[in-house]
Regions:
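Catalytic core of pol beta-like nucleotidyltransferases
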Residues: 1-6, 13-178
């Protein structure tokens, strides 16, 4: 599943319960911290961008290759395989979300901030669900849904949604002189 657009996912494994007994709070904290870190930094390994994830010890995820940088060894060594990827379906799925992001941008421009915020949350949830369904399918990381997610991430649509969310919220909360 590598291409010139690929990135390297660096998973930092933490025992959330050793940080705080409220593991949902710990997860929310680490999710926010990693999103901020990923937004601010552009670290690469051989020109592939590194994306940080923080996961709870024992958390399961599917991957064709897992390498421990701590132990300098493969945990799951990737096997090169010929995989048929449905790029046409992935492009269609991603284009639908590109179109939705543009409509949301128009809502923000038109001052319809509350409506924009509701749409943003729904679209982000649908994107998460789409990827989850894809990763849990037989095709897993090669599914059209996961490839569509990667297209959206590569094309900065996920960032655009987050930026629109901040813009809509800030505009909604701003008090203007009359």
């Amino acid at each position: 599943n590598w291409s010139k657009y690929s990135d390297i996912d660096l998973h930092i494994v933490v025992d959330f319960s050793s940080v705080n007994e409220n593991t949902e709070l710990v997860k929310a904290f680490f999710d926010e911290a990693r999103l901020r870190w990923n937004d601010k930094h552009r670290i690469t390994i051989h020109e592939f961008e590194v994306e940080i994830y923080v996961e709870n010890i024992g958390e399961k995820h599917k991957s064709s290759g897992i390498y421990s940088i701590t132990n300098d060894e493969w945990i799951i060594k990737p096997d090169p395989i010929e995989q048929v990827i449905d790029f046409e379906t992935a492009e269609k799925k991603s284009q639908d979300y590109v179109d939705r992001a543009q409509r949301i941008s128009n809502l923000v421009s038109d001052g319809k901030y509350e409506l924009a915020l509701r749409h943003i949350e729904r679209v982000k949830e649908k994107i998460r669900d789409m990827r989850k369904v894809g990763l849990e399918s037989e095709e897993a990381e090669f599914s059209a849904e996961n490839i569509a997610f990667k297209i959206l991430r590569r094309d900065q649509i996920l960032k655009k949604l987050n930026d629109l969310k901040a813009d809509a919220y800030d505009s909604m909360m701003t008090i203007k002189d009359e």
